[in-house]
Amino acid sequence: MSAYKLLEIKLKSFIENTIDLNKNDVEKAYKSRDNLIKNITEILNENLFFNVYEERNLNYGSFENGTKILELDDIDIMICIKANYRTYYDLFPNNIIKIIANYYDIYFKNECLDNETIFLNSTKLLNLLKNELAKIDDYEKADIHKNKEAVTLKLKSYKWNFDIVPCFFTMPEYDGREYYLIPDGEGNWKKSDPRIDRENIDKLNETQLNIIKLIKYWNKKKKITTMKSYILECMLLEYFNEIKNDISIYYMFKKALKYIYENIFCHICDPKNIQGDLNKLNKEERISISEKAKKCYIICNEAINLIERNNYNEAVNKFSEVLNDFNG
């Protein structure tokens, strides 16, 4: 068997055994999530303020999309609340969403309103949701997520947390698009639509999904803490549009590193076409990421040169300088 083929097999094995989530954990996590959504719906529907729009609840994020890598630490859920005659408007040009309260909010749940206004405050709503979640069996604790867009729920029986985002679902706007309205971290609301992210991931083949996982692993092990997982995925979606899909994992991985070090200085487009440029990194952060990616790209080239000379073991050792534990 050629050194090329051996390297490809080892990379796939590395992904399956070192990077991918444990299959038993995944099965257990799916069941725990579905059961939790059922429990949350039952509890919230007892509170007239929260009338759950079950058909629009949404599982999203890297766990749902199949791009999560070890360890499984969080699962994302959106719990949709029925509008019940609440309305909203968009404050241009900052795209801040204001939700106008309904009769019940104003007269019976005014603790969720901005002070002396009729606007629904997303931070206050998160706190109300946090208090309601304490009624769940197996509850351990709940806190407002650091981005103030979700409630992080910890249950006693599982090692992973659940990040729960309360949301509303809009009617079609003038352009025909529908949106989820989620907390923006400042007490207001913002538009989102994670369904688009899922559609984009569903179009990828197995090799492309493996590249996402490898790059996430590289990002994590190389301590590039300024690179958020979602930003990486968006960059790689753009990269996949520029490269042939019929090449090996190691060539695609090498070229992905090249794409990162060349394009981290550029705009990173929001695939949902809502937020505009996602690249909020400062100059120093971009330079640091670019230098690390370029260094690893050069090492990958050296490894591939060794493969071309049929030096498989030396090539594996060289790749392990980029992917920790690869030669383990």
Language model feature labels by segment:
Residues I77-N94, C167-Y174, E178:
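Short, solvent-exposed beta-strand-terminating loops
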